[in-house]
Amino acid sequence: GCDLLLEAFAQVAQQDSRLHLVMAGPDQTGWAATLKMQAEELGIAERITWPGMLQGDDKWGAFYVAEVFCLPSHQENFGIVVAEALACGKPVLISNKVNIWREIENDSAGFVDDDTVEGTVRNLQRWLSLQPKEYVRMSEKARACFESRFHIQRAAERLVEIIRCSIQ
């Protein structure tokens, strides 16, 4: 989905010169060079930071200074990085191929759309159209979504309940 995000960001960034994108994560497949070339061709290279894999305080710091987290993934079994963003109170913009999209949508913890450039553009535009109060409310809902669904204590309680039900 990184290619989709670059295409969508290029379209949306034309409307707001303040936008900046951080493309963080490991380059396990050597795809970063191709993505950087795509960013050059789209004319957005100067508006993107490529820190690579972020860990520890660097990762958490990046989450906390971000306004929103965007993952237009083609396929995610769970999306731990989405849960991490929610834990930091960051709304998420994800594709409907991230397997926790229903929880995000049900809890109003972000926006969900198709796994396409158009869907990613819609997510970004919806995000940018929020009023400050709406942004604050969605941030609160993002954190609440994490606490109620993905916090380790809550997950352990659900697992124990599933086991109890299965042995009765």
Language-model features: where?
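Short hydrophobic beta-strand element within catalytic cores of glycosyltransferases
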Residues: P91-S95
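Short alpha-helical donor nucleotide-sugar binding micro-motif in glycosyltransferases
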Residues: M53-L54, G61-A66
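A conserved mid-protein helix/loop that constitutes part of the nucleotide-sugar donor-binding site
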Residues: G1-Q11, L21, A33
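Nucleotide-activated donor-binding/catalytic signature segment of Leloir-type glycosyltransferases, i.e.
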Residues: A33-L54
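Glycosyltransferase donor-sugar binding loop
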Residues: H20-T34, G52
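A short, well-ordered alpha-helix in the C-terminal region of glycosyltransferases
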Residues: K133-R149, R158
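Aromatic "clamp/platform" in nucleotide-sugar-dependent glycosyltransferases that forms part
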Residues: H74
